[in-house]
Structure formats: structure tokens, C-alpha cells
Regions:
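Conserved beta-strand positions
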Residues: 14, 93, 120, 254-256, ...
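Flexible glycine/acidic-rich beta-alpha junction loops that bind and position SAM and/or redox cofactors
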Residues: 21-22, 125-131, 157-158, 214, ...
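A structural motif corresponding to the C-terminal end of an alpha-helix
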Residues: 46-60, 145, 247, 305, ...
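Acidic, low-complexity intrinsically disordered segments
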Residues: 2-247
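Short helix-capping segments at alpha-helix termini
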Residues: 53-56, 111-116, 274-281, 345-346, ...
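Short acidic/polar active-site loop segments enriched in Thr and Asp
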Residues: 89, 250, 308, 378-379
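Radical SAM enzyme core and accessory elements
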Residues: 2-14, 83-88, 110, 416-597
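Radical SAM [4Fe-4S] cluster-binding motif and immediate context
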Residues: 184-350, 355-357, 361-363, 367-370
């Protein structure tokens, strides 16, 4: 083997791009909220290629992972480093979503002008090639710049890309959509601890499985990762956890779209429970469906394994809207029991709610959110705009019908209206989104959720922190909370091409002055909530608090959720019949007669 000092260096930059805010500045933070699992997957795969010396014994691959949500990307500097290395290197933009594609192209344009090989992969490329009969302008623009496109997953295939890049023979398109790899025993995701440290709470990620069996029309996962699920084994997960814990990382986001439908969930949870018994304690955030509480032992074992927070795709409380989106697996009669079960185990629930289904109006939206506030014991409600994302059935149908869709991909972030609605103008729809956040995150309801937590739910201080964070994300940043972080970074020269470069005096005064005012108001709000919560915790009657949402059973005849529409009434009536049938079949206990002595 050649001496390490004499080996050639191949510089591999793996970049997870961010996207632009409404003023054209890259959304970036000192510490970001969530990690990028795509970046972790590619880093792990690239490390394996490095260890296997896929470019030959005389070549050392140096890998530089960059998450732009917490690290500034300087394309000119990257180009200079690769040029100084004799042009021997490559930049891969990984996990690029549709809203991140314009930013990736803007960076790639600079790199390509310097002759740097560039590959872009992710859900936008994969979704477009999977669902559209013709390549859209966005992909053709990339190809015209000499950028290579990668569709599909990289396990077992990335060495081909590296070899082609090293040889200067990158193909225009690498398409592995119809050859998805198995995950058991595959190289797992990994991020160096110094990169993980750039996230709030030192949180890393991994996927225990990919693919989803459901048919939601707004979803891209089923058309990119497939409807046939693939899984990692308990051994794989144990190895991932052990290597991270050895490096000081104990908090993980398991990114499976629906962990409850991972057939290995029980063996994985059992293994994590064993690790905890050995003193290896980790915490997890997971995503599940609305029927996971019906799976025997699922919630109990999830909690025993270390699950603390749960994302649930509630999406809507109108059965007609759910049916229109092919979300037929969601039954509104399951919602209360599901949420109460997670609450009983002191887990924080995050629930997604989509705005823009066919029956939605501003008035109906406010009505439904107020019903949720009163009748469902959830903690965090996350709003998103129904968006025809490239790669989804909704987008493919819209394109086929010639529907007017916004051409600016930067808006495809689930926060901006990108097409027309049957009952609202685009402006009204956008205002409905803002109205949703204002309606749910009122000081009064924030206190109600904390009261429920103090009365026997998840940790009240964590709930108070999260509620304040979500409230602040909308009120001060107008950014989806999970895209926010701690201390906003804005760089004057990192503005979207075509937008003017601001005067330095104006820019820095506005940026830093705004930071001071914003954080002052956030801290004031948090202090008020925190002090109020401490007083509440000292109240001996606080543990006895109850309200309609904390009822242990549904009142199908009187709850407003079951009176909204005819479909809702039918759902309530059906659930009531099932409950009555269960009670009728329940064995009647015989009276116990004590023996007479």
C-alpha cells in the first residue's frame, strides 16, 4: 500500500442545501432544529467507499459533510479547494427537496463555471423522474449546466459515481429508481459528533426502514422509496446506536415515515430496551400513523425503548377531506384514544394538520382548530399547506391536466400556496395558513396545554418550551418551526440571485437590531409562561385538572368533531355501534359467593 503521504487526495463535499426565505436570504442558524438523515446516509456510504479504497490504493478520499441549515456554504471557496487539488474532487448535493433545488442550482452554477464535477440527488430529482412523462425544466436546466442527476438510493451504487467523477466521466443521469436496495446489513447513516453538535440538543438520525404501504395522494415517499417497505435489522440499529453513544450522541430522530408499519419494530424496540438495561440510554423521536395504538405492545415498548416524542399524521378531522387525499387509513374516531394512550405514557405528541383540502375555507378552518383545542389532548399542532410536490400523485395529475402551478420551486416548502383552490383565492388560502397558527398558538391555549401536562401528561417544562418555540417561529420568523433553530444567521452576500445586494449599514442594523428585539420578546414570553407554570405546579389542585379533551371516552352524540359534516356523523355513528357491540359481547362477571363456614 502506498505511504499515506504519497497518496492522491480526492476531495468529496457532501452538501445538504437549505432554501431561501421570503426576502431571498438562505435560511440558516447557529444551531438547527433537526439533522439531515440524507446527509448522514451519504456520509456513511462515502466512508465505506473510503475504507474499501474504491478509487484505488493510491487515492485517499477526504469527506466534508455540510448541512447548510447550520453551516455557511461558500461555493467559490469549495471550487478553489478542488482546483488547488488539481480538480480531483466532486460536490454532491444530497437529499435535495423541491424547495431546495433552486439553492442547489445557484451553488452548482458557480462550481460548474470553475469546472468542478457536481451531482444532485434527492426527492426532487427522483420524484420528477419517477412520476412525470417528460423531464421538467428544472432538471433540464441542471443538465444544461453539466450537472449530473442521481435518482434512487445510493447504497451499493455510490462507488460508481465516485469512480466516474475521479475519471472525469460522470454520466448525465444515474437512475436506480427501479432497483431499490435492501437495507438489512447495509451501510448505516452516520454523522461525526462535531457536525451533530450543530443541532439543538445534539440530535442525530437514522432510518430503520424505507417505503410506505399507504396511498396518500400528496405524498412523495411512496413514489420515491416505493410502497414495498424495506427494513434494517435489530443488529443494524444496535450498531448505529453504539457507535453514536461512543461518540457522545444519545438523541435520535428515527426518520421512518411510519415506524409502526416497520415489521421489525418489536425486535428493534426489544434490542433498545436491552441496551438500556446495559446502561446505554438513548432518547428517540419517531413518526407513526393514527392506528399505532391498536398494535399490541407497540406504545409500551416504544416508551420502554426510550421514545419521548411522537409525530402523528392527523392531517384533518373531516372524513371527506381525508378521503379526498386517499388518507383512508385515518379514522377520526381513533384520534382521542391514540392521543390519550401516548399521554398516559408521558410522551409529547406533535400532530400534522394540512390546510387546503377541497372543503376548507377560512371559517371552517378556524372552527376545526377550535374543536381540536377543546376535544383532542394533543400537545403540538403543525400546519402545512396542501402542496402538489413533484413526485406526488397530486403533482403528476395537475401537470397532466395543465393546472396552473407556481414555477418558483423555492415556494414548495409547505408554507406557500403554489396552485389554485376550489373555494379560496390564493391570497385567502395563504391567509388561512397564517390564521391557523394564530388560532392554535394563543396564550390561553398554550396555558391549557400546560395545565394538561401538569395534570399527568408529558414534562410540563418541555411542553412549555416547545409551545413557545412554535409560537415564536411563526410570529417572528414566518418559517415552519422545524426549519428554525437558535440564532438566525444571514449573510448579506448570500442573497438569491436576481435580488439586490443591500446596503451594509441598512442590512446589519436591521439584522442585528431585529435579533435583539426578537429574542427579547421571545424570552419575555417564555419567562411569563415559565413563571405561570411554576405557580401552577405548586397548586395542590393542579393534578386534578380535567377538561373535555381529557375524557377517557368519546361522546359520539355530542362532541362537535362528530357533528361537523354528514361524513363525520357517520363516522361517529359507526364508532358508537362498534363500542356498543364490544360492550355487549363483554363477559358479565358472576357474583362472588363466599363459602359459609
Amino acid at each position: 500500500m502506498p505511504d499515506i503521504a504519497t497518496r492522491r487526495r480526492f476531495l468529496l463535499f457532501l452538501v445538504k442545501p437549505s432554501h431561501y426565505d421570503d426576502e431571498g436570504y438562505v435560511i440558516q442558524w447557529w444551531k438547527s432544529a433537526l439533522p439531515s438523515n440524507s446527509l448522514a446516509c451519504l456520509f456513511g456510504i462515502a466512508q465505506k467507499c473510503m475504507e474499501d479504497q474504491v478509487l484505488g490504493e493510491d487515492v485517499a478520499i477526504e469527506i466534508f459533510p455540510v448541512d447548510e441549515t447550520n453551516t455557511r456554504v461558500r461555493p467559490h471557496d469549495i471550487a478553489r479547494q478542488i482546483q488547488d487539488n488539481g480538480g480531483f474532487g466532486m460536490v454532491g448535493f444530497v437529499g435535495v427537496q423541491s424547495n431546495q433545488f433552486p439553492r442547489a442550482i445557484d451553488c452548482a452554477r458557480i462550481l460548474r463555471a470553475a469546472g468542478v464535477p457536481v451531482v444532485i440527488g434527492g426527492v426532487h430529482v427522483s420524484g420528477c423522474l419517477s412520476m412525470l412523462p417528460e423531464r421538467p425544466d428544472s432538471l433540464n436546466q441542471a443538465l444544461d449546466l453539466g450537472i449530473s442527476l442521481y435518482a434512487g438510493e445510493a447504497e451499493g451504487r455510490f462507488d460508481e459515481v465516485l469512480c466516474d467523477a475521479a475519471a472525469g466521466t460522470l454520466k448525465p443521469i444515474y437512475n436506480y429508481l427501479h432497483d431499490l436496495p435492501g437495507l438489512e446489513g447495509a451501510t448505516g447513516p452516520y454523522m461525526p459528533p462535531e457536525r451533530v453538535g450543530r443541532t439543538l440538543g445534539m440530535i442525530s438520525s437514522f432510518d430503520a426502514g424505507r417505503g410506505c404501504p399507504f396511498l396518500c395522494s400528496f405524498c412523495t415517499i411512496i413514489n420515491v422509496q416505493g410502497r414495498k417497505s424495506r427494513y434494517r435489522s435489530a443488529d443494524d440499529i444496535e450498531a448505529l446506536v453504539r457507535i453514536n453513544v461512543a461518540n457522545g450522541v444519545r438523541y435520535f430522530f428515527i426518520t421512518d415515515d411510519n415506524l409502526a408499519r416497520n415489521r421489525n419494530w418489536e425486535s428493534i424496540f426489544d434490542r433498545l430496551i436491552e441496551l438500556r438495561q446495559q446502561g446505554i440510554h438513548s432518547r428517540f423521536i419517531i413518526q407513526v400513523d393514527t392506528a399505532c395504538h391498536k398494535i399490541p405492545r407497540f406504545i409500551e415498548k416504544a416508551v420502554a425503548a426510550g421514545v419521548k416524542r411522537v409525530f402523528i399524521g392527523l392531517e384533518n378531522i373531516d372524513p371527506d377531506n381525508l378521503a379526498a387525499a386517499k388518507k383512508k387509513q385515518n379514522h377520526i374516531s381513533d384520534y382521542r384514544e391514540l392521543l390519550l394512550e401516548w399521554r398516559k405514557h408521558r410522551c409529547i405528541t406533535y400532530c400534522g394538520y394540512i390546510i387546503g383540502f377541497p372543503n376548507d375555507t377560512q371559517e371552517s378552518l378556524v372552527q376545526r382548530i377550535q374543536i381540536i383545542q377543546r376535544e383532542l389532548p394533543l400537545d403540538i399542532l403543525e400546519f402545512s399547506i396542501l402542496t402538489p410536490l413533484p413526485g406526488s400523485e397530486d403533482h403528476a395529475k395537475a401537470v397532466a391536466k395543465g393546472v396552473d402551478i407556481d414555477s418558483d420551486l423555492n415556494k414548495f416548502d409547505l408554507e406557500h400556496v403554489t396552485t389554485d383552490h376550489p373555494r379560496m383565492s390564493r391570497e385567502e388560502w395563504q391567509e388561512a395558513y397564517r390564521l391557523a397558527w394564530r388560532t392554535y398558538y394563543t396564550p390561553e391555549h398554550i396555558k391549557t396545554v400546560i395545565r394538561r401536562a401538569v395534570a399527568g401528561g408529558p414534562r410540563p417544562d418541555t411542553v412549555a418550551y416547545l409551545l413557545t418555540w412554535f409560537w415564536a417561529s411563526f410570529h417572528f420568523y414566518n418559517i415552519y418551526p422545524l426549519e428554525t433553530g437558535m440564532i438566525r444567521r444571514r449573510y448579506r452576500r448570500d442573497r438569491r440571485p436576481g435580488m439586490p445586494l443591500e446596503n451594509p449599514l441598512v442590512f446589519y442594523a436591521r439584522h442585528w437590531g431585529g435579533q435583539v428585539v426578537t429574542y427579547g420578546r421571545i424570552l419575555t414570553m417564555f419567562a411569563k409562561i415559565h413563571l405561570w407554570m411554576r405557580r401552577l405546579e405548586r397548586d395542590p389542585n393542579a393534578k386534578n385538572y380535567t377538561d373535555e379533551a381529557l375524557r377517557t371516552s368519546d361522546d359520539f352524540d355530542h362532541q362537535e368533531m362528530y357533528q361537523l359534516t354528514e361524513a363525520a356523523r357517520q363516522a361517529g355513528a359507526k364508532a358508537k355501534r362498534i363500542e356498543e357491540h364490544k360492550h355487549a359481547r363483554a363477559p358479565v362477571a358472576e357474583p362472588v359467593v363466599e363459602a359459609v363456614k
